[in-house]
Amino acid sequence: MLKVIGGWGNREDSLQACAQRLQQSFEYIPADPQVYGPWGVWRQDASDNDRYELAPIDTTDRDVVTAAISAVTERVNNGPKATPGLNIELARRLLDNTSGASPIWLEYTARAGFIGMKRPFNHLVLTLEDGIDESVVTRAMSALVVAWEPDRLGVASQDVQRAQGHKPPEAVVGWLTYIKDGTQFDRDALDAEIVVHEADGGVYITVPGTPDDPSMEHIRRVRIALGYPNAD
């Protein structure tokens, strides 16, 4: 599985602001009904406390979205939260799963609105299926950048993330990576095979390969350009 992983520093976002950002991202994240089920939230089964079922929600209804965010935040905090910071947990089912009988759930999680943290705490993750088309990855990345305005965002598998020696709060460098304007970035460290495109208040960096199998050699070059150490 691939994950689009991003984050940003202290930034106050209200419940309404988070709901608006979430809805804005839904407008552009591909929602092919032949491929994906509807977005929903996990709810405990009334007859079995150890079982959770995905309950679809109307992502176009602001009240429904804000209620979903509030419910997750209260569950995470074991009650109403008095300090800034909200939690978002959504998922949808991959319908054309051919890998087996077990369903594949693609999750969309975020922490937003946190302030006064010693280290960056605002964070988002969107899970994507293996073998996904590059154009879908690009659209999902752009949707998240425009909606959440992160400092950094990248798409990579867990193996690629580990192989590069990633440590928070570094950007996860993958086949496609976004960094916000003002981030340390030495373009002279890159070669001609790495494509840099300016858009959405920052730059998108594409390395050779595919979303599932990007060039690790070029990922290391991008990490050098960002001032990060590389794994041995």
Regions found by a protein language model. Name each.
Residues 41-156:
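Internal, hydrophobic cores of structured domains that mediate oligomerization or house catalytic pockets
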